[in-house]
């Protein structure tokens, strides 16, 4: 099993400016992550997700993370999403 802090640290190691929020959806291996980074600017949603999955590849391969619900935002898109939430 991997801690929520470890997930956050691994994402931030790959995306140093990232704001990362991680929640356990059950069992410790089903997680939800919201990642906000300027590195996502100009990238497709698929590419954004690949960037995060790449940061967590070892945890995913070892099944320390079994399922990951992922939401990615640029800082600008996050500002809009927070206003409409």
UniProtKB/Swiss-Prot annotation:
Signal peptide: none annotated. Disulfide bonds: none annotated. It holds the Pfam family BolA. Gene3D superfamilies: BolA-like (3.30.300.90). Belongs to the BolA/IbaG family. This is Uncharacterized protein ssr3122. It comes from Synechocystis sp. (strain ATCC 27184 / PCC 6803 / Kazusa).
